Structure formats: C-alpha cells, structure tokens
Amino acid sequence: ALMMEGGVQINAQGQRFHDETQGYSEAAVHVLAQPGGVAWNVFDDALLAFAQDFPDFVAAQGAGAVQHAADAVALAQLIGCPPDALQATLNAVQPGTDPATGRTFKRALQAPFHAIKVTGALFHTQGGLDIDAQTRVLRQDGTPLPNVLAAGGAARGVSGQAVWGYLSGNGLLSAIAGGHIAAHTAQQLLKDSAP
C-alpha cells in the first residue's frame, strides 16, 4: 500500500528502477534483478502514519524492520548508496508523471525518511494439472483421464504464464469456481454410471 500511495523502491546505486505501482509479483522480478537482489522501500512521515492502519506493517515495525533517517544523506548511509545519486532520485519524485517509468506521483516525499529492506520471494506456485472445461484431468495428448478431476491449486489456474497475470484472489477464484464445476462433473459421472 505504501508504494501505491507514493513510496519508492531504491537500489544499491540510489536509484529507482521500475514503476512501483505495478504490483508485488512484478516488483519481485525487478527487485531480484538489482545488485544483491535487494531494494529499499522508502517513504516519509505521512506514509508512515498511513501504514499504522495495517496490522502486518505494525508487526514488522515492532520487529525492527522499519529504519529511520533524518535526511537524504542519512538515508544514503543506511542504504549504502551514493548520497548524490539518492538525492537526485528523491528530487525527481515530484507531482506528475515520471518520464522514465510512467508512474504518476501526487506529491514529493519529505524528510525525515523511513525505509524497509526488501527482496523478492516465491509466495506460492500457480497452476497444476492441465484440465478441460469440466475440470477433467487431461493426458499429454489432450484426452481426459476417466474419473479424474482437479480444481483449485491442483489444476492449472487463470493467472497465465507470467507475473503480470496474477491478481490477488486468483487462487480462491480457481478453488471456488473449479470446485463448483468439478462437483457438477462428478454428479454427472455418477448419473452416467448408474444402472
């Protein structure tokens, strides 16, 4: 939420490297491509106050994940990046559209700054067995296996083959809709096999 509201991600060179509003799956790929596979989520007091409404953020803050810096020089020291590069990056965060990434900012970030060191991680897998429209598991030749159904995380999902296809809730969507379809398919299989 902090990135969507104006926070930025900074790498070890003191630079932004993508549009932070794309989503966490996309961000993970960009972060892992940075030196050391890490970045810093940087935000200001207004965003720190906003974050207090999120229990997971408050828990991370209580565990010491949130670091504080009085100004850009102190923030550069914390991140371990060149102060002049970081200052130029922060100066470029102004209301309007960033020409490098296409991201739109509502306002500039103001010192003091706060930062959390982040990296990308595998949250969960997406997809599974190939199925047809009735949730029947398919062989390699595309024909259905008799009486074998799959839904939810056991079946291929709707997210596609790239990070941009994932939306929060896709797993639940596949489980509910696929389970519903599988139940109807199973019911029909039972009817068809009844004497």
Predicted regions and their residues:
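Predominant activation on well-ordered alpha-helical scaffold segments within soluble catalytic domains
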Residues: 39-43, 72-76, 87, 91, ...
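Short, ordered coil/turn segments that flank beta-strands lining enzyme active or ligand-binding pockets
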Residues: 12-13, 133, 140, 177
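A short, polar/proline- and glycine-enriched secondary-structure boundary/capping micro-motif
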Residues: 27-31, 149-150, 194
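A glycine-rich dinucleotide-binding beta-alpha-beta segment and adjacent secondary-structure elements
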Residues: 85-162, 166
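A conserved FAD-binding loop/helix module that cradles the flavin
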Residues: 116, 157-193
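An anion/pyrophosphate-binding glycine-rich loop and adjacent beta-alpha core
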Residues: 1-85
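Hydrophobic "anchor" residues
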Residues: 16-17, 137, 181
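Generic secondary-structure signature for well-ordered alpha-helical cores
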Residues: 15, 22, 77-84, 88-95, ...
